Swiss-Prot record:
Keywords: Allergen, Disulfide bond, Glycoprotein, Secreted, Signal. This is Gamma conglutin 1. Induction: By sulfur deficiency. Belongs to the peptidase A1 family. It comes from Lupinus angustifolius.
Amino acid sequence: MARNMAHILHILVISLSYSFLFVSSSSQDSQSLYHNSQPTSSKPNLLVLPVQEDASTGLHWANIHKRTPLMQVPLLLDLNGKHLWVTCSQHYSSSTYQAPFCHSTQCSRANTHQCFTCTDSTTTRPGCHNNTCGLLSSNPVTQESGLGELAQDVLAIHSTHGSKLGPMVKVPQFLFSCAPSFLAQKGLPNNVQGALGLGQAPISLQNQLFSHFGLKRQFSVCLSRYSTSNGAILFGDINDPNNNNYIHNSLDVLHDLVYTPLTISKQGEYFIQVNAIRVNKHLVIPTKNPFISPSSTSYHGSGEIGGALITTTHPYTVLSHSIFEVFTQVFANNMPKQAQVKAVGPFGLCYDSRKISGGAPSVDLILDKNDAVWRISSENFMVQAQDGVSCLGFVDGGVHARAGIALGAHHLEENLVVFDLERSRVGFNSNSLKSYGKTCSNLFDLNNP
């Protein structure tokens, strides 16, 4: 009897062992399949964020993948914004959302020392906790600001795989702001829920990506002119040979990049030096410096135009009043007078499209000590304001303009602009991508894998 029992127990042990191995193997296979379909946490060389233009506002936006489970969140592209902010008061659901306590290391990293108390709701929810960090967010279009809750959650972004978009990679504790809902109610494209800040600040998108993945401190912007096709932002070194398979279609464009020094203001904004604007062979140099205060990082005491802000939150390039007056006068002198018609706001100089079939004069930005010239394509400075009416796409910013020149999104479209933060320089092509037979939508493969 005892011998039979021992034999039965031996068989049971063997059976259970095989069952355990089978279940364990099945579980591992299932887990592997699950992870293969999910964002990976590997270290990429290059990250890609597709960007679209909004036809009604002329501004650009991107779908950011956030939360758990991941979902797309449409956000305005704000080149000079300090951080990513999104409204959280409605429909924010995530199992990985956290609100760091006041005076925590996350608060220090975000450079905020203000505590936040929620008064909007009697129950806690994303964006509404007490004794958390307060973070001030701004709508860059309306200039409205509001205090919100510093938060952290999962963010995912595409890596590259050969010449294609690769799997998504995750930042598990990405810092951002849950901002007041009123900030997203005016000025933004429809359905956009916040803004994506790329300024030089501790928790801007690119700085968190650089830190988490160990990428070179460089990002490149290529904005599409067409709302039906994507442009892109690339994070990392596009000149790295390891990325050649992905950028193979743009090697000639990269080879011809011209670089000019980059200046970053105390607010983390991006400026380049502009010595003059040239219309055909005529230079536009104002007699008075347009800047408000000599303490500005972009102030120059000479008669030069000075620092030009690069921005994506103005659809058109904005000139201070003194520069605008001289520039439009010189431009008008190089256009047929009989073609000029009543201006259509917000522009100051418009023409009958049928009477300017000969084209517009060339417009160049003369940059760093005349060594670099950025030619603005007529497609980037002439705007179809109405049927049959084409306007000069520059806007009068008044006497209190933030900068002498603010290069707007329309100016940047169909240009590859490289922000090399490690070497404090900006790269661009002297001519638009059209001269290479390319557009921002086909310069890189932006199709989902």
